[in-house]
Amino acid sequence: MRHDSRPPPWPLIALAAVGMVLAYSNGFGGTFVMDDVSEIVENEAIRTLWPPWVPMFEGGRLAHRPLPYLSFAMNEAIHGLAVPGYHVVNIGLHCLNGFLVALIVTHVLRLAGWRQQPRIPAEWVGAATACLWLVHPLQTQAVTDIYSRIEIMGTTAIFVAVACFLLGRQAATARLGEASPCARACWAASARRP
């Protein structure tokens, strides 16, 4: 919920998106490595989307993570075993997580009483934090290793749950039904691990 009419920091957001694509674009030419081989290339269960529980719970050698495995099956249905398609999905999820970081930081600052004491809007601090988070070298494995989509999706679910909590906390009249997105995000976070 916006407290004023300031526009979002679009230049900073655009810079973050360009920086992220540049930082991770070298992964597009990569191949399937390590766990990618047994869990994607050699996993016959992800070659089907119907019934959905087949890719979610069958095949592969490692413990199953239902939602990521379903996403691998969707990738396989659209791109086959073309590696760039898998990287595009990982980068898209990472970009979504960057947006959620900006949202969370902005709302936490507002809840803490940030009133532009240093003359920097909370939106700009949130966007700058997201920029740093998006291109930080520690994110490289999660974004460029295809099988690490499991970690990206878990992070997405946790960030959605936190964002829903913060937005619900700001709402003047919270109703029980408004907790539903938060509960679903918590379930999604737990569904990424056995």
What would you call each of these model-derived segments?
Residues 1-194:
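Polytopic membrane enzymes that build or remodel cell-surface glycoconjugates and lipids
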